[in-house]
Amino acid sequence: MSYRKAAVAAVGLALLASGAHAAPFEAVSFKKGQSALVYDVGSVRREGAMAQAWVYQIVAAPMDGASMVATFREFSCAMRRTRDIARRFVSPDGQTLRSVETPGEWQDVAPGDERFELMQQVCTGKPQRIAGQQMSVFDFQTVVRDALGAR
């Protein structure tokens, strides 16, 4: 079974069994090795050639206790660059382990870069939605980690 089919099946089951722990979000997901890169369609804000969105990297095996990194990311669509404005490192149970509130440096994003497809989706506003709409990000994290075979 492919990753997307497994994630969709797991999301469907989780929707039946779970309650929301945080505000619902609309997810679009990109698989990235043993992690998934997800952004909240509802958080996208555009002004001219600039866009901002909440992006979540969910990992199968926690790194320093964090199973998810929630990043408020800014995109310079015309210049094909991106930077992180703020980041939160979150445990599997939704606790913030640490946060970084200092904007990072701009980084160029070229075709082939893992952030390229994400930037195109955020900048063009044509996401392909997946199952799991209106789940909390924490419930979604659990479903994605299960689909990734979390340890």
What are these regions (language model features)?
Residues 6, 18-21:
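Intrinsic disorder/low-complexity segments in short proteins, especially the signal peptide
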Residues 9-17:
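Bacterial N-terminal signal peptides
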Residues 20-71, 75-151:
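N-terminal secretory-pathway/extracellular module detecting exported/lumenal segments
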Residues 1-8:
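Bacterial N-terminal signal peptides that target proteins for export
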